C-alpha cells in the first residue's frame, strides 16, 4: 500500500511538472504571435497608404479613398495593441497616423491632391511609432 501511494504521488508530481513545462513555452510563443500580428497590421496599413499615394499620383481619387479606408482597420488594431501594452508614445504616433489617414481620405473625396501630403504624414507617423 505504501509503494502504491509513492507511485501515485510521483505520478501526480510528474504530471504537474509536465504541465508546468508545457505552459512555460506557451507564454513566449503567445508573445511571438502578438508581435508578428502587430508587424503584420503595421505593414498592411503602410501598404494601403502607399497604394493610395500611387492612386493619388495617377489622379484616381476613388481608389485612393478605398485604399485609405482599408488602412484604417489595421492602424486602429495596431494603436489599440500599443495602448494595451503601455507604449504611450507609440500609440499616440499611431493615433496621429490614423488622423492623417482620415484627413487624406477627406481631401481625396474633394479631389484635392493635398491628400498625398497627408498620406505622407501618416507614413511618417507610422515610422515614428515603430522606431521606438
Where are these predicted regions, by residue range?
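Long, charged/polar, soluble alpha-helical segments
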Residues: 1-132
Amino acid at each position: 500500500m505504501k509503494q502504491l501511494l509513492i507511485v501515485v504521488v510521483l505520478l501526480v508530481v510528474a504530471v504537474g511538472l509536465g504541465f508546468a513545462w508545457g505552459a512555460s513555452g506557451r507564454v513566449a510563443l503567445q508573445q511571438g504571435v502578438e508581435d508578428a500580428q502587430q508587424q503584420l497590421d503595421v505593414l498592411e496599413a503602410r501598404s494601403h497608404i502607399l497604394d493610395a499615394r500611387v492612386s493619388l499620383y495617377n489622379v484616381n481619387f476613388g481608389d485612393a479613398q478605398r485604399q485609405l479606408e482599408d488602412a484604417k482597420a489595421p492602424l486602429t488594431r495596431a494603436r489599440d495593441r500599443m495602448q494595451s501594452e503601455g507604449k504611450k508614445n507609440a500609440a499616440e504616433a499611431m493615433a496621429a497616423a490614423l488622423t492623417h489617414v482620415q484627413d487624406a481620405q477627406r481631401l481625396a473625396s474633394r479631389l484635392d491632391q493635398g491628400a498625398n501630403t497627408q498620406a505622407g504624414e501618416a507614413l511618417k507617423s507610422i515610422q515614428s511609432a515603430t522606431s521606438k
